Amino acid sequence: MRGKHFVFMLFAAFVLFPVSGFAQTYAIRNVRIVTVSGATIPSGHILIQDGKIAALGPNITIPSSAKVIDARGLTAYPGMIDAHTAIGLTEIDSISATQDINELGDLNPHMKASAAINAQSEHVAITRANGVTTVLSAPDGSLFAGQAAIINLDGWVTKDMLLKDSAATIINFPRDVRLPANANDRQRRDAEDARRKRLELLRKTLRDAQSYARLVDAKVDGDSDLALRALVPVVKGEMPAIFTVDTAAEIKGALDIADEFKLKAILSGCAEAWRVADLLRSKNVPVLFSGLLDLPTSDLDAYDSHYSTPAALSKAGVKFAFSAGGASSVRDLPFQAGMAVGFGLDKDEALKAVTLYPAQILNIADKVGSIQEGKVANIIITDGDPLELLSHVKHLFIAGKPVELKSKHTDLYDTFSKRP
């Protein structure tokens, strides 16, 4: 009898208090639509159903059940994407309890960022309020740091946010030796030796993964190695390997490793990508550029070498996307793209480098990156160019759901603007 009562009460709860996650139909009317992948629609409508873009254009049928948003005078853009961040894995640098980005040891390719992402991170709301709706959240620290996850910036728990788990494996390429000018010969030898050993470990691990892949294909029984098993799709070219690099020498070294082991490589960081732009184009390797606001790597470089790198990559024909990096700085992603426009990057290319291009590089362009029928409805509606500092996001949709623009920043503003 109690079981029947429980079932009845459960049924009544669903009828009287429907789950908030149930999809609703929305219509954004009279809005300028920058599709990014096609022509801009001067004035049209966007229909959102079941979390996706169902229709768009100047003459579409809008169901009477749709919740209508009149966006006259505003512009719709696809939600922006940062293709290499630490959002959800780190909160406050000085508080170790909020850090879940590093694991001990050098070989952690089996560690998944999705297992540690904090959906309630303050960085989530702050970042999306500036129009960034999707990020790649990546581990750091180790040589093989782990597997990154692509998430939408809305959801109660990680499962709600997850767009693609195990999207790429992060490999922190051994850094060039950088010592002060007064370093002695022994210090230089020790540093070079340490770097050489890390390169040897990188190659050995990838060779072992290739051997392990052959055993897996042959269905040979034996003890399972979690780290090597996680690298099987990487050495088979089924999962991208994101190499973090900065100098031209590091970029060349990572490209050599990618060629040697036939990896599907993506380069992240790339402060000196401008030095090897033609090489990157010839290798057809995409770049996630995150050094725009950094100082030049050499005192002999021009002051604007980093600011002009996106223009140099674009001119050379290198597919690239912007990455603000870290967690707290991701909110500045659109403004970094805007700054690059001031140093020679075409304005349309800058917009694509924070929308369509990162989606293509991360192999999620069938879901996000542009405003097209059938794609996930990640849409921002602004009162101006989203790459300009004085523009504001007025409405935000993530996975077809309107999302509040409140954040820790707006809460603090509201609190202290009332101060007597």
PLM features: what roles do these ranges have?
Residues 8-18:
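Bacterial N-terminal signal peptides
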Residues 21-25:
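Boundary at the C-terminal end of the N-terminal hydrophobic targeting segment
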Residues 31, 46, 51, 73, ...:
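Divalent metal-coordination and catalytic microenvironments
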Residues 31-34, 44, 372-416:
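C-terminal cap of metal-dependent C-N hydrolases
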Residues 33, 37-77:
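Histidine-rich, glycine-flanked metal-binding segment
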Residues 74-141:
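Metal-associated gating/positioning segment near the N- to mid-region
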Residues 92-93, 98-104, 109-110, 240, ...:
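His/Asp/Glu-enriched, well-ordered alpha-helical/loop segment
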Residues 123, 128-265, 392:
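Polyanionic/metal-chelating signatures
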